[in-house]
Structures are given as structure tokens and as C-alpha cells.
Amino acid sequence: RDSSTSRGLGDVYKRQLTHRGRIETFAHLGLTCFALELMPRISRAQSMDILSSQSNLAGYKAVIEAVCKLPSAVPMMMTAAGTIAPAKALILGAGVAGLQAIATAKRLGAVVFASDVRPQVKEQVESLGGRFVEVKSDENFETAGGYARETSAEYKQKQQEAVAEQLAKTNFAVTTALIPGLPAPRLITKAMLSAMPAGAVVVDMASSAGGNVEGSEDGKIIVINGVTVIGNSNLAASLPASASPLFAKNILNFLDTMYNKEEKSLNYNFEDELIKGTCLCYNGKMIHPSFTGA
């Protein structure tokens, strides 16, 4: 099937070793394969950005999952019997998932705090009603593509101190921090969990990549030092009626850039950064830098 084309969300960064043999098999079969999670972060690619469309839903669902496990109400309630204070939320990572988590928690009535290694996102956090937990540093931890990069040991120490201080006052937290090609950064330790209020909940969206929370397990809900820790890195799958149409539209928009209406076939222009950035194998060879080391 030399003319066959495969597309999908293969998670090449996270599972390169696991998937390498599979991609080699695809190449030997003459398949042309694309990994859409490698889509360049440029304006022309926004309608094809699977990571963004799915992460947006995941950020929303993470807050819903956390709130459902809380033993208390989220918004402030003033009644004749007394006043219920609003819940405090902490969102770690202000990418697409994190920003949606901030917006969702705010709409539910929580007092929302957020932290990110990229100080540039402070304005976005505040525009959604969140309060930015800033860690002062002269270092730049943002890649050219807008993703977070690995931080220095000094910064990690400062960040951990700031997060620990805020966590001690937090009723529920959502962690979304991922670094392409590397294990998820450890943001919350078991000691930090033990300092959280009774009944606190943490959702670790990076659990399949090693986890932002010490002790979290992907696909499991466990209690660590009195805190309910939900490990779930595939929350969008729990919203199939919303996730599937967006996923399908992303793929359709991507295929549309390659489709030649006159010839009624797909033409691969490897000068196009969308094609070059996402194609794993072509013409019997593995060509993406993730595999070739180029």
C-alpha cells in the first residue's frame, strides 16, 4: 500500500522508544506517516493543532474532576446560617490546558492562583481572573515554539518554595507541566501534599510522563498524605462528544493543505514546514529528526 497515509496523535516525544519499531514497520510497508502532536506552533497551523484542541478540553475536565472530589463547595456562599468561604485553586502550568483550567475554576467561583516558568504568560493568567505566582529569574525558559524548556536547579528550588507556600492554602490544584522530549518536571512532593488543607485534591495531567506530583499514578486515584491525587493524562477522552469532532476537524484541515483538487490526490511538499515538521516516514524511510537525530 505504497500510497497509504497514516495520521494521528502518536505522542512521539513521550514514547519515541516504544513507537520506533512501529514507525520502522510503517516505513518498510511504504506508508507515509504524520504525527500531528509535532505540528509547528505557527498561526497557519492553529486550525490543525490537535494538542491545543484536546488540551483545552482536558484543562476544563481536570477542574471538574477535582471539584467533584472536594468535600466542600467551591464558590462563596452567604446564607442566614453563615458564610462559606470560596475554595482556593492553584494551576501549575499556563499553557492551553492550564489557561482553560484557570477560566473554568474562576467561573465556578474559586479564587485562582497560577504559576508558570514563562513570565510572559502572566498577562494571560490575569486576564482570566487568576493571580500569578511569580518566581523572579533572569533566565528564559520558553522555546522558540512557545513551549516550556528545562529549568535550572536554582530556579527549581525557588519555584518549589513558592509553590509550597501557596499549596498550604490551596483546596484543589491542577498540574499541567510537560517538557517535550523529557520527563515531566516534579513540582509537588509528598511533603508539600501533607501541608495542604484536609480534603484537598490534586489532578496530575502529566502522570503518564512521570508526573508533576510525587507518587501519582496514571489512570488511578490515590490518597497521599491525606490528599486525593488523580492521575489522568487523557482527560479529553472522557468528553468524546466534544473531543472527537475537534480531532476530526484538525485532521481534515491538515489534509486539506496537501490535497490537490485537480489531481484528486495528496501531494507532499516538504518545503512546507507543516509537512516537514510532522512527517515521520516517507518513501520507505524514517525522516523526522526525532528518529534520525538530525
Give a label for each model feature.
Residues 75-166:
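Glycine-rich phosphate/diphosphate-binding loop of Rossmann-like nucleotide-binding domains
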Residues 2-13:
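Single conserved hydrophobic/aromatic residue that forms the stacking wall/gate
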Residues 37-80, 207, 213-294:
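Adenosine-phosphate binding glycine-rich loop
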Residues 23, 63, 101-102, 122, ...:
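Generic hydrophobic/aromatic pocket-lining and core-packing "Φ" positions
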